[in-house]
Amino acid sequence: RSGDPQARVVIATATLALQTQLANKDIPTAVAACRKVTGRTVSHAVLKGRSNYVCLQRVRDGQGLEQEALVADPSEASGLGAEVVALRRWAEQEAEDDGLADRDDAPDHSPAAWAQVSVPVRECLGAQKCPFGEVCFVEESRRRARASQLVVTNHALLAIDAMHGGTALPEYDALVIDEAHELVARVTGAASVELGPTQVERVAKRCLPWLADQSGLEFLDAADTLQEGLDEAEVGRIPGGDPAVLAAVRSVRDAARQAVTGLAGGDADEVERNQAQAAAQEIFDIAERMAKLAEVDVIWVSESERFGRQLNCAPLSVAGLLRERVFADHAVVLTSATLKLGGDFRSIAASVGLDPSGADYRGLDVPSPFDYAKQGILYVAKQLAAPSRDGIAPDALAEIAELLWAAEGRTLGLFASQRAAEAAARYCRAEVPDRVILCQGDAHLPKLTAAFVDDPEASLFGTLSLWQGLDVPGDTCRLVVIDKIPFPRPDDPLMQARQQAVTQAGGNGFMAVAATHAGLLLAQGAGRLIRTLDDRGVVAVLDPRLVTARYGSYLRASLPDFWMTTDREVAIAALRRLGDSGRTGAEG
């Protein structure tokens, strides 16, 4: 509704951090510019998922907090208890000041402490039943969103809104999806569920006080049955359904159903009982979904040091959900610096449910302000052997050290695995001892990033979290090293299933899934080099397949238009010239 002062636009970005950046920096700048041109002030609000706000019912009436958390003087409490006390005091101050008790504004705390003052979506009593419904922070955030012309949210909440019939966001007239290259992954995450023995046991114990018959014990037993089934299964995808695992899932489903029935009929003010019932209902819904073995879902067994073995379930595709629930009724703009893969929008369009031919969308490629061909070099180490799954090769390590030496540090190393990053850090520390080599895992990432920025001659090595979002302009980063093309792991159950589905439908599963995934990450990683008009440097890809494989041209077309070479001496000479010019400029 062009020009309508009541029209509402929703902007959804990938992460909470980017949401905060938009709300605190970019949106106010845009609003000020709009006011200057039109004379109108555009109202705006931020909307996040429920668990990002304090729950006053948990703060004021909640049970189950550690006793030490109830100590009046935080100095007398320790660890978790002190954090909870601080959060509760802050929340009460937020309520008094008409704030929103947004987690981003909270005092320093651990996830465990935040869990004591917030509530999962399914366990929320709802504004009508909750004694604090009229002063609920979530309800207030929604009221502010409904009163605003511009609402800033995230991909996950957009997905929840689509899955639940438009209940999470206010009605809107247009939607802008920022960082749209991450949309499929974020929506997939929001639509995925997991089921583990510890999770089932925890919920069963919450239900026990109100279950007088055997149903409570059967719920506990179901957790043991699930553990046994997972222990017998192989880690990975179970496309046909492992009999022992499926039997265990059905056991959990049936026990959860009995618990839900047994907990029914409680009074509205029996908060803990109602929340226990909601938790049991969630376990039932997850187990029921998994037990169906629907063709639209992918189910697999995972194992981690923290959670042990778990059963995971994710949608095979989110294209239909996006096409029917997001794109069908609104004008939608998808924006990102890396939407063109292989030189066009077809791959991204297909992944979000649009016609790859362009019949139902218009693609606009806005030229970059950067002259990539003059500002950067793409060096592909064609002389190296193709990377293997056995770890980074000695020749590749030597290549990294030589490039880092030529760049005088100032290197961002992007690696396919933590093991490769650590191996490269050890090697370079030994071979180039006069340079500081920081490695992900040595400290918290924000601290490492700050150290990288503060010391212009330092280098930072890491994995996926460094590929996207790291913004280090200037001489701090003259060299970006990518050890291998970032294809998904061959044993990734979800990617494996999606690739197989495309192939069975007559398409090229590898190009549609694996190459698209790699192209997106390569574009993001290479994009770390040039951040301003004055930046210069080299992107070094130590994977010869970028120029020797048939899919190499597709991946190269996904990258910024750097001048390309396969000659190591050319890359090293360019890096040394940058060092010389930097010193000359400093002396001048």
Model segments located where?
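Conserved RecA-like ASCE P-loop NTPase motor core of nucleic-acid helicases/translocases
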Residues: 8-17, 333-335, 409-416, 540-542
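A substrate-engagement module of RecA-like helicase motors
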Residues: 3-149, 239, 254-265, 495
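A contiguous, basic/glycine-rich beta-loop/short-helix subdomain that forms a polymer-engagement track
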Residues: 115-149, 164-166, 258-382, 391-398, ...
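Conserved helicase motor "Helicase C" RecA-like lobe of SF1/SF2 P-loop NTPases
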Residues: 416-441
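Conserved interdomain linker/interface between the two RecA-like ATPase lobes of SF2 helicase motors
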Residues: 197-277, 374-405, 411
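N-terminal targeting/trafficking signals and adjacent low-complexity tails
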Residues: 540-588
